[in-house]
Amino acid sequence: MAISKEKKDELIKEYARHDGDTGSPEVQIALLTSDINNLNAHLKANKQDHHSYVGLLKKIGHRRNLLRYLKNKDIQRYRDLINKLGLRR
């Protein structure tokens, strides 16, 4: 359920803080959110796929940790990101 290279490059370009930025929390969270959304769609069609469900839970946990880090480091960047991604409805 990996995202395509074009989609990944588009997300990196949109959320990067500067040229060549692939490791900032914003980029990592955006990529994880895309993966999580794809896995959710996959699991709706394949309810018995328990292995993918475990992978989904790991990705959600990783994103949660990155969001907590960003919230503690810079609350304004955190708020902008969750609004942009549509998290925390």
Curated annotation (Swiss-Prot):
The keyword RNA-binding applies. One of its GO terms (molecular function) is rRNA binding. It comes from the Bacteria. GO terms for biological process: translation. PROSITE patterns: RIBOSOMAL_S15. Keywords: Ribonucleoprotein, Ribosomal protein, RNA-binding, rRNA-binding. GO terms for cellular component: cytosolic small ribosomal subunit. InterPro entries: Ribosomal_uS15, Ribosomal_uS15_bac-type, uS15_NS1_RNA-bd_sf. Pfam families: Ribosomal_S15. The keyword Magnesium does not apply. Transmembrane segments: none annotated. CDD domains: Ribosomal_S15p_S13e. NCBIfam families: S15_bact. Belongs to the universal ribosomal protein uS15 family. One of the primary rRNA binding proteins, it binds directly to 16S rRNA where it helps nucleate assembly of the platform of the 30S subunit by binding and bridging several RNA helices of the 16S rRNA. Forms an intersubunit bridge (bridge B4) with the 23S rRNA of the 50S subunit in the ribosome. Part of the 30S ribosomal subunit. Forms a bridge to the 50S subunit in the 70S ribosome, contacting the 23S rRNA. This is Small ribosomal subunit protein uS15. The lineage of its organism: Bacteria, Bacillati, Bacillota, Bacilli, Lactobacillales. The gene is rpsO.
